């Protein structure tokens, strides 16, 4: 059954809180969601690496004008990192560039994590979607071309150890927008003198939106591919997952009042 045959892209408005799966870029994932909803206008509020999973708020229609508020909201992550191994991308998708023994103890690790809390400068990684002369930096990096990057001010509100198993550490990170978790992990590895890289990364919240509100994209696909539903029924069922504009505006107003 071919969906939406001879149906124009729809003008729909709202925010969809999606749980991005592992192994797909935010851009490709966004295109997939756009096709499922047959939406005319869509945008997200900050990319997640292909390796990463978790909260990706997707804005439809008029809600795209409000995306900047979420883009500049603080974020919370759970990250697992392997100590003793460094990669060129700072995560397990990259090439291993060094292997070193891990000699730090729990006390040194706690001191390390505490040193990151607060306002600090962070140099964005070359393997990132930031652009130089209109070209993403990661495309240069893949060719072995590296450029100096200007440090950016970030704020780490919390960086705490959840658990440690041999050379694998699991961390809770609450940070400002624009923070690269991969770079934090790489810097932790440098502090400890052994190197480190991200092996798992999950975004738990964006601003006021938390992980318990997320929708699994498999739920949306099950509706889309259900032959017992016609297009109108599919639209109704999918649209029910959207946070409507009036609720979004109310939430933003409440946030503004809390900051006053």
From Swiss-Prot:
GO MF term (any one): tRNA pseudouridine(55) synthase activity
Reactions that this protein is recorded to catalyse: uridine(55) in tRNA = pseudouridine(55) in tRNA
Entry's EC annotation: 5.4.99.25
Residues holding substrate: 44, 77, 180, 201
Keywords: Isomerase, tRNA processing
InterPro entries with a match to the protein in the record: PsdUridine_synth_cat_dom_sf, PsdUridine_synth_N, tRNA_psdUridine_synth_TruB, TruB_C
Active site: 49 (nucleophile)
Any one GO biological process: tRNA pseudouridine synthesis
UniProt superkingdom: Bacteria
Top EC group: isomerase
Family listed: Belongs to the pseudouridine synthase TruB family. Type 1 subfamily.
Role: Responsible for synthesis of pseudouridine from uracil-55 in the psi GC loop of transfer RNAs.
Name of the protein in its database record: tRNA pseudouridine synthase B
Gene of this entry: truB
């Amino acid at each position: 059954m071919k969906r939406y045959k001879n149906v124009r892209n729809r003008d729909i408005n709202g925010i969809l809180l999606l749980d991005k799966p592992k192994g797909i870029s935010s851009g490709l994932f966004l295109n997939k969601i756009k096709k499922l909803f047959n939406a005319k206008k869509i945008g997200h509020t900050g990319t997640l690496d292909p390796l990463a999973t978790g909260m990706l708020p997707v804005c439809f229609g008029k809600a795209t004008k409000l995306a900047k508020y979420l883009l500049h909201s603080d974020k919370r992550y759970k990250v697992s990192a392997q100590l003793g191994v460094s990669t060129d991308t700072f995560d397990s998708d990259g090439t291993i560039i060094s292997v070193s023994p891990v000699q730090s103890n729990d006390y040194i690790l706690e001191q390390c994590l505490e040193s990151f809390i607060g306002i600090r400068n962070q140099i964005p990684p070359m393997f990132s979607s930031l652009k130089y002369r209109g070209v993403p930096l990661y495309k240069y990096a893949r060719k072995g071309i590296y450029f100096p990057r200007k440090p950016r001010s970030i704020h780490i509100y919390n960086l705490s150890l959840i658990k440690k198993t041999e050379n694998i550490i699991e961390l809770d990170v609450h940070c400002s927008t624009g923070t690269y978790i991969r770079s934090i992990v790489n810097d932790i590895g440098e502090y400890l003198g052994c190197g480190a890289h991200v092996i798992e990364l999950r975004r738990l919240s964006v601003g006021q939106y938390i992980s318990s509100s997320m929708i699994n994209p498999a739920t949306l696909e099950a509706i889309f591919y259900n032959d017992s539903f016609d297009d109108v029924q599919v639209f109704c069922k999918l649209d029910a997952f959207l946070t409507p504009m009036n609720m979004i505006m109310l939430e933003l107003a409440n946030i503004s009042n809390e900051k006053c």
